[in-house]
Amino acid sequence: MSVLKKLAGETIYYGLSSIVGRFISFFLTPMYTYSVIIDIPKMGHLTELMAYTGMLLILFTCRMEASYFRFGKEKEHDKAAFDNSLTTVFSISIFLALIIFFAAPWIAPALGYAGEEVYFRLLAGIMMLDAFCEIPLSRLRFEGKAKLFATTRLFNIFVNVVFNIFFVIVCPWLYAKNVILITFWFDPEFIIAYIFLAQVFGSLTSFILLRKYFKGLGNVDWKLLNRM
């Protein structure tokens, strides 16, 4: 009975973070749609660029979380499997993020976003941070730490939403009133960049909350890594 109770509790926590994430997406979409500074073309750009992020994130993680779950079940390989997965994803993510960052002046016009290189640089940051957190989050699930898993995900969502509201609603309102603290840095034409920046802050929050799980970064068991 205690096992079933624990399983039910974990399911609730994992489900809660997923449900809240979906709810927030439903909340943000109409906020973007009815915003006075996000027109239909910008909304299309936002949707398209986020689709790229979802696809590229697979490359950033190389599905190492699946390898970790497989080899982490072997008690003698638990720590080594985690360190291998963490170090691999960390290295690949930095490498790919740097490529996108420096190649942005060529990537942007090739995809129809000439002069908007900042979008791709911010997306590189989002994907890098999300990839960094993927293995630690997998470890939380592996260890049954559902509360910490849900807390991390919910803080990410909370920070993302707060900054979305700030950039999409508060800043344009203050900008229209010529508040100098806003007008000297805020540019409504780059609202998509601010939305991505909000996601960077959310992902950075997860990274900070999971920082203790990066202690094994750099430790590699090459023999086990070849199997993984």
Where are these regions (language model features)?
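Interhelical loop/hinge segments that connect adjacent transmembrane helices in multipass membrane
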Residues: M1-L7, Y175-Y194, F207-M228
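Signature of the first transmembrane helix
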Residues: V3-E65, S93-A104, I126, V161, ...
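Transmembrane-helix boundary and interhelical linker motifs in polytopic inner-membrane proteins
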Residues: L4-K5, T33-M43, L56-T88, I135, ...
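Alpha-helical transmembrane segments of multi-pass membrane transporters/permeases
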Residues: T11-G21, K79-D83, F120-L129, L140-V168, ...
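Short membrane-interface helical motifs at transmembrane helix boundaries
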Residues: Y34-S35, F95-A114, C171-T183
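Membrane-interface helix-loop junctions in multi-pass transport and translocation proteins
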Residues: S35-G44, E143-T151, F158-F207
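Alpha-helical transmembrane segments of multi-pass membrane proteins
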Residues: M55-L59, I94, L98, G112-P136, ...
